[in-house]
Curated annotation (Swiss-Prot):
TM ranges: none
Native organism: Parvibaculum lavamentivorans (strain DS-1 / DSM 13023 / NCIMB 13966)
Name recorded for this polypeptide: Phosphoribosyl-ATP pyrophosphatase
One Gene Ontology cellular component: cytoplasm
Higher taxonomy: Bacteria, Pseudomonadati, Pseudomonadota, Alphaproteobacteria, Hyphomicrobiales
Pathway: Amino-acid biosynthesis; L-histidine biosynthesis; L-histidine from 5-phospho-alpha-D-ribose 1-diphosphate: step 2/9
Alphabetical UniProt keywords: Amino-acid biosynthesis, ATP-binding, Cytoplasm, Histidine biosynthesis, Hydrolase, Nucleotide-binding
Gene (UniProt): hisE
Coiled-coil annotated residue ranges, if any: none
One term of GO molecular function: ATP binding
Enzyme kind, highest EC tier: hydrolase
Length: 109
């Protein structure tokens, strides 16, 4: 099986199926049971670990931590009842636009 973005969709389906499951049955169910703040904190921790690996020049660490980061992002999406497809649509909307133009349209500096 080739690796591609559809893996994220499949993983999200598994994560979403764990919502409301017994927290003792899986790590994902345990995270989801803790709520959005705990899921957001874990995502932040994984983001920092990814940055540390990148700054350290640890390519393998970047790959591993990025996988953790994406997993925890999907957990947060499920916890906050946000469909990743909405994020994909927003990325598609922004595609081809200058980052500076996009920021100006949002009133950012």
């Amino acid at each position: 099986m080739a690796a591609d973005a559809s893996q994220l969709d499949r993983l999200f389906e598994v994560i979403a199926a764990r919502k409301g499951a017994d927290a003792g049955s899986s790590y994902t169910a345990k995270l989801l049971a803790k709520g959005v703040p705990a899921c957001a904190q874990k995502l932040g921790e994984e983001a920092v670990e990814t940055v540390i690996a990148a700054v350290s020049g640890d390519g393998g660490g970047v790959v591993s931590e990025s996988a953790d980061l994406l997993y925890h992002w999907l957990v947060l999406m499920a916890a906050s009842n946000t469909d990743p497809a909405d994020v994909y649509a927003e990325l598609e909307r922004r595609e081809g636009r200058s980052g500076l133009t996009e920021k100006a349209a949002r009133g950012e500096r």
